[in-house]
Amino acid sequence: VSIRFDDNLHDISFQGPLSVEFLSKYVEGIRDLPYFAHMQTTLFDLPVMISRTGYTGERGYEFFCRGQDAPTIWARIIEQGAPMGTIPTRFTTLDLLRAESYLLFFPYDNSEMYPFEDDVTGDTLWELGLDFTVSPGKVGFRGAEEHYRLKGKERFKIYGVMLEGTTPADEGAPLMKDGKQVGVVTVGTYSSVNKHNVGIARMPVDCAVDGTEMVVANESGDVKCKAHSMPFYDPDKKRRAAKG
């Protein structure tokens, strides 16, 4: 067995509802690529691996290419995608989109970022709402016993909040109920497209019920909110997993 460290692999994320329309002009079979699948192909006559993945909650793709090819691919996408509205963006934009789509980001939604006053850091899949990542009853993997032991012992839940108005929750804003802090908002955003003001928050289990009234204590002032299930956008994943 040999191990070779190679940093000559670049990742370009190409996201949006028209991404498949653009790619279908250059990549044969791209419409048949299932959600979370990948294919070895070429783009602009350059070798790439294209995956049906992304971090936006929208239909999208990622291109894994050689470092020397990345600038060419990037420039061609921006230039030839301009008529369809293609523009470059940065991770800050993705950070806002993930709030709508319930895409967690370590450590920013975890106790490593917001440690407990009276408990050790570290979160369970049950607390994060990620227990679906383990097949029910599956055993034999590292941490299996601990995973099942902690079921039903959640100290908190990661859950959504829907705020009033258009002022988004501050990152790290205290989540208040009956005048006491009960949690923290890990990320918030107001969507001018979907016209909702939403956030991901850590809160007590008994508060993680749709309609629970709370208050987000922003630095600029308090904002009323209600607990809301996630994702807020495309909850059935019909857009990101669409066929054809």
Spans of model-derived segments:
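Conserved, structured C-terminal
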Residues: 1-244
